[in-house]
């Protein structure tokens, strides 16, 4: 006779966890909302407003992921229970083996959904922007900023996210003084929101002829892209708009005309710029999107004292607000909030960030 206790214990655990996450994710409400969204998308007139149709389509995709997964888990557990009964009646080890395989697949699916539940913020499912800014330290800090940009681009690529370089300011000798990228993909902001903070690099500088150790800092700031229907009031009189000739990456066209745009929101001091579009009009539209997103995030930060303090101190990029330390000589990268370490420094700099990101999300940071 074969052993049934392990798989029955596993099924009991899967059943309990499925019910817990069903409640946590407000499954019944999502089912109702999915029906409403489907009904709206079936109306012919919805396509007269493509932006609304696109927003609803994105919402439907997110709702379907949760609803379909939970339904599949519930049905899957019932199917495994039926297989176990069949195996017992027929005394068939092969059927029990098949039941175990299906139970393991359900466990994997549930674990993935449990991780997704951490993306419960109102904008976690949206696209986002990532600003990188070099700290004091000249060329070394600017080179570090370019390394971080490459790291995040590689990470986004590994996730299947699309990236768009919105603005880049070249360093004096090498590297970058600042850069902004737009990241598009499911839960882009949810994945990256805990990456906001100071990143510290310790290494023997390739720019130091004496090969001495240097400590450099760069800041990352992640904020969600907000929909046009979010009520954010921007008074045109509060804006200073400058146009200039782009520098750095972007192709030949941007360097021939003064198409790059910089907008300063004078009441808040927020500055946004864009140079990747082919016209002033395109770049201005992109700048206004970024400005709306930053103003929204600023309002959200007022509800969170710690985040607000970090944003106010963002110009002082140094020892405060550090989230991660990259000590290349010791082959050690450590997240200072969760204690997670990775000694494969090259893999991390090549975009292997999930271990750090998942730990910070699970810690509720």
UniProtKB/Swiss-Prot annotation:
Primary localization class, coarse: cytoplasm
Provenance organism: Haemophilus ducreyi (strain 35000HP / ATCC 700724)
Record-given protein name: Peptide chain release factor 2
One term under GO cellular component: cytoplasm
Any GO BP annotation: viral translational frameshifting
Summary of the function given for this chain in its UniProt record: Peptide chain release factor 2 directs the termination of translation in response to the peptide chain termination codons UGA and UAA.
Keywords for the protein's UniProt record, in alphabetical order: Cytoplasm, Methylation, Protein biosynthesis
Family to which the UniProt record says this protein belongs: Belongs to the prokaryotic/mitochondrial release factor family.
HAMAP family, per the entry: Rel_fac_2
Comment field (misc): The gene for this protein contains a UGA in-frame termination codon after Leu-25; a naturally occurring frameshift enables complete translation of RF-2. This provides a mechanism for the protein to regulate its own production.
Pfam families hit by this protein: PCRF, RF-1
InterPro entries assigned to the protein according to its UniProt record, in alphabetical order: PCRF, Pep_chain_release_fac_I, Pep_chain_release_fac_I_sf, PrfB
GO molecular function: translation release factor activity, codon specific
Biological classification of the source: Bacteria, Pseudomonadati, Pseudomonadota, Gammaproteobacteria, Pasteurellales
PROSITE patterns: RF_PROK_I
Domain of life: Bacteria
Modified residues annotated as N5-methylglutamine in this record: 252
């Amino acid at each position: 006779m074969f052993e049934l206790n392990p798989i029955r214990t596993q099924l009991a655990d899967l059943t309990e966890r499925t019910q817990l996450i069903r409640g946590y994710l407000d499954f019944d409400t999502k089912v109702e909302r999915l029906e409403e969204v489907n009904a709206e998308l079936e109306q012919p007139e919805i396509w007269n407003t493509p932006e609304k149709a696109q927003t609803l389509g994105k919402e439907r995709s997110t709702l379907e992921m949760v609803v379909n997964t939970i339904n599949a888990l519930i049905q899957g557990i019932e199917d495994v229970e039926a297989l176990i009964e069949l195996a017992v009646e027929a005394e068939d080890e092969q059927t029990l083996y098949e039941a175990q395989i299906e139970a393991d697949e359900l466990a994997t699916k549930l674990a993935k959904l449990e991780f997704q539940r951490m993306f419960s913020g109102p904008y976690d499912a949206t696209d986002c922007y990532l600003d990188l800014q070099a700290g004091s330290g000249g060329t070394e800090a600017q080179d570090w900023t370019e390394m971080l940009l490459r790291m995040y681009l590689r990470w986004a690529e590994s996730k299947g996210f699309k990236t768009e370089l919105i603005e880049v300011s070249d360093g004096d000798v090498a590297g970058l003084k600042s850069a902004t990228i737009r990241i598009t993909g499911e839960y882009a902001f949810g994945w990256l929101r805990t990456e906001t903070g100071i990143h510290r690099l310790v290494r023997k500088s390739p720019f130091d002829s004496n090969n001495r150790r240097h400590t450099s800092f760069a800041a990352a700031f992640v904020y969600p892209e907000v929909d046009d229907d979010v009520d954010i009031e921007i008074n045109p009189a509060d804006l200073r708009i400058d146009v200039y000739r782009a520098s750095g990456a972007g192709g030949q066209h941007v360097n021939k005309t003064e198409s790059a745009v910089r907008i300063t929101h004078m009441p808040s001091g927020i500055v946004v710029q864009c140079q990747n579009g082919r016209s002033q009009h395109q770049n201005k539209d992109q700048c206004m999107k970024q400005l709306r997103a930053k103003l929204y995030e600023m309002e959200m930060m007022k509800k969170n004292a710690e985040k607000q303090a970090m944003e106010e101190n963002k110009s002082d990029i140094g020892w405060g607000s550090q989230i991660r330390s990259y000590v290349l000589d010791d082959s050690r990268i450590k997240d200072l909030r969760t204690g997670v370490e990775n000694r494969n420094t090259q893999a991390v700099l090549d975009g292997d960030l999930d271990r750090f990101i998942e730990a910070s999300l699970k810690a509720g940071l």
